[in-house]
Each structure stands twice: as C-alpha cells, then as structure tokens.
Curated annotation (Swiss-Prot):
Organism of origin: Rickettsia massiliae (strain Mtu5)
Annotated GO CC locations: cytosolic large ribosomal subunit
Role according to the record: Binds to 23S rRNA. Forms part of two intersubunit bridges in the 70S ribosome.
Cysteine-cysteine disulfides: none
PANTHER family the record matches: 50S/60S RIBOSOMAL PROTEIN L14/L23, LARGE RIBOSOMAL SUBUNIT PROTEIN UL14M
Protein name per its UniProtKB record: Large ribosomal subunit protein uL14
Superkingdom assignment: Bacteria
SUPFAM superfamilies: Ribosomal protein L14
Signal sequence, renumbered to the chain: none
Family as reported in the entry's similarity comment: Belongs to the universal ribosomal protein uL14 family.
Gene Ontology annotations of biological process type: translation
Amino acid sequence: MIQMQSMLEVADNSGAKKVMCIKVLGGSHHMVAKLGDVIVVSVKDAIPGGKVKKGDVYKGVIVRTKTGVVRPDGSTIKFDKNALVLLNKQDEPIGTRVFGPVTRELRAKKYVRIMSLAEEVL
C-alpha cells in the first residue's frame, strides 16, 4: 500500500530512477494506493539525458508493491520493492520499455499498453 511521502522505483526507461508519492488519486478519502491505482509523483532522482528531470511532477500507475495482491484462488503475489510506470497527460506510458514483471490485474484497470511493454506478466 502506497501513501503520501512513499518512495518508489520507476520500472520504465523514462529516465527517472526514484519518485515520491505526493497525492493518491481517486476520491477525497482515498488514503492509500494499491496495485493498478494512479498516483501523482515528484521525480527525486533521474539520469542525465532522460526524458524527465528531477523535480518534475507526473502521474504514475503502480505495477509492483511489497504488500502484494491476493488472487481469487487464494494465492498471493508480493514483490521486493514498490514500483510504478510514469504516465503523460494523456495517461499513456512515457517510456518505451517496462523492466521487471507486472501483474495481470493491470488488465482489469485498462492498462493493456503497459502489459504489452513489460518483460514478464505474472
């Protein structure tokens, strides 16, 4: 579960490495974000020459969480780190590749484009 001030890794090749959550979108009482939710983030660490730079504010969709997700069959999928993919103003991924695995739950949230860019879908 991701809340305000949470630090996340970036799972795409947009140029950002670390981001911090500054707002969880989805209603006035939406305090935490789970897998597939959209949050507003600030770039805290970026590589030189990337598409984004430090201090920029973007939306991002969460693709991996330490808390994990429980499937209908009772199995749980957890990851070592929290990660997200940065989105532009039209809610499309900024990067052209997604590193690491993503979960099938993104399909229900209408993020099929991220699933097609990912190396592995669990």
